[in-house]
Amino acid sequence: MGDPICKWRSATPRNVVELVSSLPHTEMSEEDFKETIENKWPGFLHTPYQLACQLGLYVVNNGIYTPRFSHDINETEAKAYLEDIVTRYYVPNPYTPRGFKNIKKPIVLEKAIVNYIESNPNETELKKIIGLLIMEEVGNFSSIKTFLSNSNVLDITKENVSLKP
């Protein structure tokens, strides 16, 4: 079973605002970042960090923490950010290591869904489409469905998906 996005919380503007406001807004050593975030949000590095990393809210590279935002953001900014990041979100994501053994190269999920719908206009079941694309059962479906609802090209209604006009 593949989890295209972690299950901690849904990728909503409100949750992105909470994550960004909790993260340090300046570059620092990975060690300082871990100490700072654990003091501010005990347990952050156990699960919440996954969603923050999956959404590109920060990166740690060569021992240096770099935040996406240098300031707190509001829900309008978070919504715009989610609308942008959903267009570039790929599977498998390095922060969701379970599953995805059948995928030879990463897929940009929104683009792959659009291409699938264009080629198979009678197929509308989102979970089935994602399962076909990732070549296994979809884990955390409600989380990926919520994330994809940020798309400006996909219309998601209950369990179905179509292209927006």
Regions found by a protein language model. Name each.
Residues 1-165:
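Donor-sugar nucleotide-binding helix/loop cap in glycosyltransferases
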